[in-house]
Curated annotation (Swiss-Prot):
Its EC number is 7.2.2.10. This is Probable calcium-transporting ATPase. It comes from Trypanosoma brucei brucei. It catalyses: Ca(2+)(in) + ATP + H2O = Ca(2+)(out) + ADP + phosphate + H(+). Belongs to the cation transport ATPase (P-type) (TC 3.A.3) family. GO terms for cellular component: ciliary pocket; plasma membrane. The keyword Transmembrane applies. This magnesium-dependent enzyme catalyzes the hydrolysis of ATP coupled with the transport of the calcium. Residues 1-65, 111-258, 322-770, 857-885, 943-1011 are cytoplasmic. Residues 85-90, 279-303, 795-835, 906-922 are extracellular.
């Protein structure tokens, strides 16, 4: 048998037709030879495994970043020059650069291959063994040995080993938990009848690999194995989703490319100018060798160019970005949002569309009865409303026709019977969680809601209120037998016997029935009224009941209704309860007592969260597998829809989406707020459509089926109660499954972006200052004001601490009133870059100014400084000072550090003056500035470090420095140099205040134009 011979739609075929197509006798199974032949054709029944990416490939991938490559090149050239000049101190620079690159690569490799976790989690759902019929014998085999055509037995507690067609039921019903595929907590009823013209993704006559059998026993035929199964399709979809860079990473990469080009051109210009100047000022001599004439000057000019590259590249930027994002994840964790992927923190702040699941995210995932009704003595409807959306048993939570009633069961005999039926036709239970002070359920949500309803009706006060009425009912009635729910009759019932002494013989044995109201009503011949009287069910009664059911199940209510009835019957031994075919006859001639309507209600905080989203310019789109009417009712309650009367262009089903043209789909995703009756493929399709419109999309999900869409979205958000597969495929997990948490995370993401902009502004303006310093000294042929090692120290340590502290800046008050940033919006726009340039140029000129000030103060002329390379007598004191100007460099380095600390204060706010945005608003920044200045003083006044960084302590007598021990701490006695440092540094504050003032004026002018 070949793969092309497999039935394409086994659900639409009868069991006999499926068996014939697969060439198997379901009474005997396949023979051993047939199994072997089919294994050769179809392979083994397991999800495919791909070898992990080799470690060396992961390491190489970390060096694809432009800035990293420039640093690698700078390290290589620097190392080569250190070898040529044979100076041990010169090896410090390439060593530090390589150390940075290794750390970056280590972090990158650690974060790689997130998809493999999701794929491995998928495999955990597939069972290890299966019970199979082969050669007429029942055998237990490894699940991976199954082939199409194998006849497999499944029973309660088993996980399904492959996609199979149900061919025989060995119990009254078969129920499967398919939540890993469809995300729905309601168990799926299974049948052997074919499903033709189906609209459901998972038809009732099929069971699927990885799902669990929760009730019953059946015989099935394997139709799909391995990668061909539904779970295999999900595995393939997850694997095929490529990791895409976040918007922040893209913008940082673009910034890196731009920076690298500018650096490259400037380095070439500086190298060429310095080389030309060298040859212009150095005439060849007879004793000059080729090395001293050509190689040495080239190496020197190259060294200056490399220093310029090191100055221009913000080496600390990746570490600061990572730290800022990590701080954001900590703050998000406090709001129950657990971030698995650091860059995604900022992505959420950019998001323009949030695609949210309904159940459990927008709603409480706690089914609650909101409405119930019985009939009055005059045949009119008696309505009850119940409040509180959770499982809590709230006293006095029932109103009857607008009036609060404290003991409704004492006033309504039909309601008493309804509550008894709801409790006894029930397998769920409630218990009080002392830790959370909440009532929690065990069992189906629908049945738990009925228990809560009954307890609220009984209104029994006390510590045992959570199960008080149930205990009372179970004391009055003995449950003898249960007639399980079947899809055909849409009802279930229990046979009970009264244990109350002296009860009338006619009411000793009863059949309590609950089910679909229309089915229960169809089989009813009598009705119980609120006064306890049982009367004939007239046409008028029937009409009023149907009208009431239509009222609460339709329109904006869309409640799920359940009907209740009972029937006096014989003792259990005299009733035919063994044959499911007779269940409908047993449940006939019923007495209808009433009905209730329930709903998974919206979370109270979600409506406000959606309003915040609107204010922030974020669309909320609900994508659910629930029916359209229920989903629209929830959207109305949340304010996403104004009414359910006309939802044209706002609400679509998955089937309607499939019928659209590509143009219609594009139009739909731009206007719709709801997609109902969707399956996993629709989620994938909607994410792609939104991304095609250049919208940044966040997607929530909890099931295995959601994994591909979660991975495809710009940011996938899994529910804390969801599957491990969904969590592994996502970038964020909501511990409390709450939509309002997403909105808090969006706010945090926006704050992170603003802070990222501020520390990039700080770092880049500082780097521009360093570039200007190197550029000016290089172009004018001045001695080196700053060495590469000093630049690395400033970029990584001195600047790194304040830049990181800027991540603690408080968010702007109007942060959630701003529109989302466009995908193409750069981190740094034109005017902002101009501001960086102005500040950076001042930083550079101030550094060079301080450097020149020292020389000019000590009798050097401009000519001496610009022709210092012509010094040939290195025993001359002037030449020695020009070749190694340690004091001037110490002043230049000090000015650079102090001016950058003051510039960090400027970065507290992009546009607000320091008078408004005071330094005290970020104590971490003040601590960072203090730490950076302390570190600078340590490298200056501890001789060991001063020698390492090739500077001298300012204001300390040279003789004291010469006699000092390497680890002693020196103290300045002359502060003239430090006064100069302050004079050159402080103006940066006033310059930035002027630029902020101009920016505020420009923004006001733009606002006036808009008005």
């Amino acid at each position: 048998m070949l793969p092309e011979n497999l039935p394409t739609d086994p659900a639409a075929m009868t069991p006999a037709a499926v068996a014939a197509a697969l060439r198997v006798d379901t009474k005997v199974g396949l023979s051993s030879n047939e199994v072997e032949e089919r294994r050769q054709a179809f392979g083994i029944n397991e999800l495919p495994s791909e070898p992990p990416t080799p470690f060396w490939k992961l390491v190489l991938a970390q060096f694809e970043d432009t800035l990293v490559r420039i640093l690698l090149l700078a390290a290589t050239v620097s190392f080569a020059m250190a070898v040529v000049e044979n100076n041990a101190a010169d090896f410090v620079e390439p060593f530090i650069i390589l150390l940075i690159l290794i750390l970056n690569a280590t972090v990158g490799v650690w974060q790689e291959n997130r998809a493999e976790g999701a794929i491995e989690a998928l495999k955990s759902f597939v069972p290890k063994t299966a019970v199979v019929l082969r050669d007429g014998d029942i055998k237990t085999v490894n699940a991976e040995e199954l082939v199409p055509g194998d006849v497999v037995e499944v029973a309660v507690g088993n996980r399904v080993p492959a996609d199979m067609r149900v061919v025989e039921l060995h119990s009254t019903t078969l129920r499967a938990d398919q939540s890993i595929l469809n995300g729905e907590s309601v168990e799926a009823m299974k049948q052997i009848e074919a499903v033709k013209g189906r609209q459901e993704r998972f038809p009732a006559c099929m069971v699927y690999s990885g799902t669990a059998i929760v009730y019953g026993k059946a015989l099935c035929v394997v139709v799909r194995t391995g990668a061909s199964t539904e779970i295999g399709t999900i595995e393939r979809d997850v694997r095929e989703q490529e990791e895409v860079k976040t918007p922040l990473q893209v913008k940082l990469d673009e910034f890196g490319v731009l920076l690298s080009k500018v650096i490259g051109y400037i380095c070439l210009v500086v190298f060429a100018v310095n080389l030309v100047r060298w040859y212009a000022t150095h005439k060849p001599t007879k004793n000059e060798t080729f090395f001293t004439r050509y190689i040495q000057p080239s190496v020197h000019c190259l060294k200056v160019a490399v220093a310029l590259a090191v100055a221009a590249i913000p080496e600390g930027l990746p570490a600061v970005v990572t730290t800022c994002l990590a701080l954001g994840t900590r703050r998000m964790a406090q709001h129950n949002a657990l971030v698995r992927d650091l860059p995604s923190v900022e992505t959420l702040g950019r998001c323009t569309v949030i695609c949210s699941d309904k159940t459990g995210t927008l709603t409480t995932n706690m089914m609650s009865v909101l409405h119930a009704f019985t009939l009055k003595g005059d045949g009119s409807i008696k309505e009850y409303e119940l409040k509180d959306s959770r499982f809590n048993i709230v006293s006095n939570s029932v109103t009857c026709e607008g009036r609060q009633v404290s003991s409704p069961l004492e006033q309504d005999g039909a309601l008493t019977k309804l509550a008894n039926i709801a409790v006894l036709c029930n397998d769920a239970s409630l218990h009080h969680n002392a830790a959370t002070v909440q009532v929690e359920k065990i069992g189906e949500a629908t049945e738990a809601a009925l228990l809560v309803m009954s307890e609220k009706f009984a209104n029994i006060k006390g510590d045992s209120a959570v199960n008080a009425f149930r205990t009372l009912c179970e004391g009055k009635w003995k449950k003898n037998a249960t007639l399980e729910f079947t899809r055909k009759r849409k009802s279930m019932s229990v046979h009970v016997t009264s244990t109350v002494t002296g009860s009338p013989a006619s009411s000793t044995n009863n059949l309590f029935v609950k089910g679909a109201p229309e089915e229960v009503l169809r089989r009813s011949t009598h009705v119980m009224q609120d006064n306890g009287a049982v009367v004939q069910l007239s046409a008028t009664h029937r009409k009023r009941i149907i009208e009431q059911l239509d009222k609460i199940s339709g329109g904006a209510n869309a409640l799920r209704c359940i009907g209740f009835a009972f029937k006096p019957t014989k003792a259990v031994q005299h009733v035919r309860l063994n044959d499911p075919a007779t269940f409908e006859d047993v449940e006939s001639d019923l007495t209808f007592v009433g009905a209730c309507g329930m709903l998974d209600p919206p979370r109270e905080e979600v409506r406000d969260a959606i309003v915040k989203c609107r204010t922030a310019g974020i669309r909320v789109v609900v994508i659910t597998g629930d029916r359209k009417e229920t989903a629209e009712a929830i959207c109305c309650k949340l304010g996403l829809l104004s009414s359910t009367a006309d939802t044209t262009g706002l609400s679509y089903t998955g089937q309607e989406l499939d019928a659209m043209t590509p143009a219609q789909k594009r139009e739909a995703v731009l206007t719709a707020v709801l997609f109902s009756r969707t399956d996993p493929s629709h989620k994938m399709q909607l994410v792609q459509l939104l991304k095609d419109e250049r919208l940044i999309c966040a997607m929530t999900g909890d099931g295995v089926n959601d994994a591909p869409a979660l991975k495809k979205a710009d940011i996938g958000i899994a529910m804390g109660s969801g599957t491990e597969v969904a969590k592994s495929a996502s970038k964020m997990v909501l511990a409390d499954d709450n939509f309002a948490t997403v909105v808090k995370a969006v706010q945090e993401g926006r704050a992170i972006y603003n802070n990222t902009k501020q520390f990039i502004r700080y770092l880049i303006s500082s780097n521009i200052g360093e570039v200007v310093c190197i550029l000016v000294t290089g172009l004018f042929g001045l001695p080196e004001a700053l060495s590469p090692v000093q630049l690395l120290w400033v970029n990584l340590v001195t600047d790194g601490l304040p830049a990181t502290a800027l991540g603690f800046n408080a968010p702007d008050r109007d942060i959630m009133e701003q529109r989302p940033r466009r995908m193409e919006e750069p981190i740094v726009n034109g005017w902002l870059f101009m501001r960086y340039m102005v500040i950076g140029v001042y930083v550079g000129l101030a550094t060079v100014g301080g450097f020149l000030w020292w020389f000019l103060r000590h009798g050097f002329s401009w000519h001496d400084l610009t022709t210092y390379t012509a010094c040939s007598d290195m025993t001359n004191g002037t030449c020695l000072l020009l070749a190694n100007p340690q004091t001037a460099r110490a002043i230049a380095l000090s000015i650079l550090v102090v001016v950058e600390m003051l510039n960090a204060l400027n970065a507290l706010s992009e546009n607000a003056s320091l008078i408004v945005s005071r330094p005290s608003s970020n104590v971490w920044l003040l601590f960072a500035i203090f730490s950076s200045l302390s570190l600078h003083l340590i490298i200056m006044y501890v001789p060991f470090f001063a020698k390492l960084f090739n500077i001298v302590p300012l204001g300390v007598d040279p003789h004291v420095v010469q006699q000092a021990q390497p680890w002693s701490i020196l103290t300045p006695t002359n502060f003239d140099d430090w006064k100069a440092v302050i004079v050159f540094s402080v103006p940066v504050i006033f310059l930035d205040e002027l630029l902020k003032f101009i920016t505020r004026r420009m923004e006001k002018a733009q606002e006036k134009k808009k008005d």
